């Protein structure tokens, strides 16, 4: 059971909350949690209701405490000359000052389990509770109906019929139910422009943007573009993490390093939410991200490649994993 990964304070708080929620969760006053209806619903056509047995994964997000103080701290951390400039907090210190309390975290867990949802993961910073259940269980838990929609371009997605409902005692404790809809999909913004037949002869002429093959950017070009040539640091002794929503092919990275005479930087994949890591349609972006880091910091000791599902919940969990790992 997941309880073994929770601190003792959270376990004790959970026991009390579980009793409270199991007593009369259904009869409790509910409150609408705003911000869960995707704007593209206005241009979408409703198709039908999501099958009752379809599995749904959600990230229950809790609000941070002391947000005014956090905003001030963030400003000072990045203001040269300030006494706090560059003095970043450890994960433990951040949790003590800004994370939700153990009792609030336990309350969200207790609510989820009282509704029949399975808690699939908890996190040390107490900001996210990952849960899963079939569509019918999710609908009952949050007082919504999950429907399927189709956009004019043909893509289909899931969305709730209305804003989720939560018990009044969770107001201020639960900020968002991420994953009710699948409307948002991250994608690259580069577009291929069709070339008419008469222009086919110029299709393979290199665009002289950079000094690399086919006019591509070499490591020197990249440093010039970002005004990094005058910076002596090369990343020696440091590790980097990159946020990704797709996989990549390792040989693409090693070929890049070999062609430009760069060191062979070790890569370590960190797969989030059971993501397979298999390269898909977004693999090119992932490859570019990794190569960019190697180009500007060739002496780094390792790159951690965090890969999660291309979904709202996947984005939340991947960023949160980077923060809590603190590698």
Residues of each region from the PLM?
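N-terminal secretory signal peptides that target proteins for export/translocation
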Residues: 1-9
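Intrinsically disordered, low-complexity segments
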Residues: 3, 20-22, 209
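Positively charged, low-complexity intrinsically disordered regions
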Residues: 8-12, 208
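Bacterial N-terminal signal peptides
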Residues: 11-22
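Sec/Tat signal peptide C-region and signal peptidase I cleavage site
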Residues: 24-28
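Substrate-binding/charge-relay-adjacent region of secreted/lumenal peptidase catalytic domains
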Residues: 29-124, 130, 135-327
């Amino acid at each position: 059971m997941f309880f073994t990964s929770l601190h003792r304070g959270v376990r004790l708080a959970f026991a009390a909350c579980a009793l409270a929620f199991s007593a009369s969760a259904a009869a409790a006053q509910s409150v609408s949690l705003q911000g869960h209806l995707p704007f593209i619903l206005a241009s979408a056509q409703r198709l039908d209701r999501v099958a009752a047995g379809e599995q749904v994964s959600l990230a229950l997000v809790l609000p941070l405490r002391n947000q005014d103080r956090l905003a001030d701290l963030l400003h000072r951390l990045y203001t040269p000359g300030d006494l706090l400039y560059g003095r970043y907090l450890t994960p433990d210190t951040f949790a003590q000052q800004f994370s939700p309390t153990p009792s609030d975290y336990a309350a969200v867990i207790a609510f989820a389990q009282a509704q029949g949802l399975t808690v699939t993961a908890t996190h040390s910073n107490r900001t996210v509770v990952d849960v899963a259940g079939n569509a019918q269980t999710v609908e009952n838990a949050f007082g919504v109906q999950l429907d399927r929609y189709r956009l004019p371009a043909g893509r289909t997605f899931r969305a709730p019929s209305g804003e989720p409902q939560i018990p009044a005692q969770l107001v201020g404790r639960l900020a968002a139910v991420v994953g009710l809809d699948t409307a948002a999909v991250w994608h690259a913004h580069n577009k291929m422009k069709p070339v008419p037949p008469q222009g086919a002869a110029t299709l393979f002429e290199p665009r002289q943007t950079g000094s690399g093959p086919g006019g591509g950017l070499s490591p020197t070009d990249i440093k010039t573009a970002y005004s990094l040539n005058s910076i002596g640091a090369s990343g020696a002794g440091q590790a980097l993490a990159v946020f990704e929503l797709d996989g990549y092919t390792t040989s693409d990275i090693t070929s890049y390093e070999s062609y430009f005479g760069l060191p062979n930087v070790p890569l370590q994949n960190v797969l989030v939410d059971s993501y397979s890591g298999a390269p898909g349609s977004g693999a090119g972006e992932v490859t570019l991200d990794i190569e960019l880091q190697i180009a500007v910091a060739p002496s780094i000791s390792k790159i951690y490649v965090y890969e999660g599902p291309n979904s709202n919940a996947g984005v939340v969990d991947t960023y949160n994993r980077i923060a809590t790992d603190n590698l």
